């Protein structure tokens, strides 16, 4: 197993359906509960563990998940409201060392609860036509609403697997 991609790389069907969206939303719906169960009672030593040499700590991963979901949610909304807007990338490495990443992980879990609730509601209202709306990512090019919803679900699971690997070390 490649620990960088413990659940594999993001796989998006060529033709995404509303049923696919529903499945991804089910994963998102249970995520914060599962994340809290995994990290909620960890001590400082456990929060400082990494899943591989040079990787982020468990604490940084939790804060990164919240930061990324926030950014991806904004991109999703822009794709639904604007005509193919261009969105900037964010420097994940620099965000991961900002002072707010020293906060308790519960701060980011609470943030995720709100963001994910909004994602779930918005996602449940999507139409087939809206799945093809898109935005232009500064580095990754054109991304559709369908792909963004897939990534919202995959990204959380991807980093939960990283956290689990770190805690097993």
Residue ranges of model-derived segments:
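Solvent-exposed interaction patches of small proteins and small membrane subunits
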Residues: 16-19, 23-26, 82-85, 102-110, ...
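Short, contiguous, helix-prone interaction/anchoring segments in small proteins
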Residues: 19-54
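Short low-complexity stretches enriched in small and charged residues
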Residues: 14-19, 27-32, 73-78, 114-116
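Acidic/histidine-rich alpha-helical segments that form the ligand environment
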Residues: 26-32, 38, 95-132
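A generic "functional-site adjacency" signal
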Residues: 22, 29, 55, 70, ...
